């Protein structure tokens, strides 16, 4: 599933191609995504100018002014590409947004777990966004807030870190990598975190995500950015997917367990 760095990479790639462009038409080949595509979407978008391309958690937010928004989620394997407007559609190319400059924005989603939603009003008023926690790269994510969010939580620290009510966008890959950088055992109870450890974890999450964004995200299977390029952060994983290999910090062996039904990778010698 595309995580925050991948969605931010797509947002950055879309921005210069979309901002200031007008939507001429929308082609919907398959409306049955995770939630049905608005049957009147083409009529609602035709003639509107894109004012902004933003991101909240793992959602792309395309704004047209006057509180008119498209909320896009890539699901498990979705992608959004900018292509010449005469590019023939392929299998799983479900929507095209035809622009006024000879290009289109194509939504591709083999598993149809993603979403393209029309919303009137502030984005944070949408039910999918209204209860999200702070952005990890913003000032709203700090040690004090993290400790407050984890107070009373006996679940594993990694599971809590992946909860969007605690902080948004820290998916499985980046939770593993952030906890390794912070030297924290993903299995320990979330409520056991000290103030100093919370500060270190905040910095590690920010540093890990910033590095991943700079590398264009991670491409493990099929992720591509808005112009079709893969990400490269997977080349720098310290622990994720490295069970039985040497820890880059101490030389011990990376172990694997399951927490919250997700594979978890860590160094038992380095992470306490």
Swiss-Prot record:
GO terms for molecular function: 8-oxo-7,8-dihydroguanine DNA N-glycosylase activity; class I DNA-(apurinic or apyrimidinic site) endonuclease activity; damaged DNA binding; zinc ion binding. Its EC number is 3.2.2.23, 4.2.99.18. CDD domains: EcFpg-like_N. It holds the Pfam family zf-FPG_IleRS. Binds 1 zinc ion per subunit. The keyword Metal-binding applies. GO terms for biological process: base-excision repair. Coiled coil: none annotated. The active site is at 2 (schiff-base intermediate with dna), 3 (proton donor), 58 (proton donor), 262 (proton donor). Its cofactor is Zn(2+). Monomer. Involved in base excision repair of DNA damaged by oxidation or by mutagenic agents. Acts as a DNA glycosylase that recognizes and removes damaged bases. Has a preference for oxidized purines, such as 7,8-dihydro-8-oxoguanine (8-oxoG). Has AP (apurinic/apyrimidinic) lyase activity and introduces nicks in the DNA strand. Cleaves the DNA backbone by beta-delta elimination to generate a single-strand break at the site of the removed base with both 3'- and 5'-phosphates. Belongs to the FPG family. HAMAP family: Fapy_DNA_glycosyl (MF_00103). This is Formamidopyrimidine-DNA glycosylase. The gene is mutM.
